[in-house]
């Protein structure tokens, strides 16, 4: 079941949760989507700024499996 997250801080808190399994990063020409899989929901954050997306990618938790998609 999908859920949308609007704020970067909320996304980082969700990514640090114990039930967060993996993060998928989808890059389009317009935006970058970060999708974190938790036990119940798939949380999605959409970022239109490429520099913010790179910063967020660097600040993801180290134990989380990160997969980049086109």
From Swiss-Prot:
An annotated GO BP: axial mesoderm development
Xref: Gene3D superfamilies:
3.30.720.90
Task: Give the InterPro entries listed for this entry.
Answer: Ribosomal_eL38, Ribosomal_eL38_sf
* UniProt GO cellular component terms: cytoplasm; cytosol; cytosolic large ribosomal subunit; cytosolic ribosome; eukaryotic 80S initiation complex; focal adhesion; postsynaptic density
Cellular location(s): Cytoplasm
Q: What is its main location?
A: cytoplasm
Q: Which positions does the record annotate as the modified residue N6-acetyllysine?
A: 9, 67
- Functional note: Component of the large ribosomal subunit. The ribosome is a large ribonucleoprotein complex responsible for the synthesis of proteins in the cell.
Q: Which PANTHER family match?
A: 60S RIBOSOMAL PROTEIN L38 (PTHR10965), LARGE RIBOSOMAL SUBUNIT PROTEIN EL38 (PTHR10965:SF0)
- Assembly and partners? Component of the large ribosomal subunit.
Q: What is this protein called?
A: Large ribosomal subunit protein eL38
Give the source species.
Homo sapiens
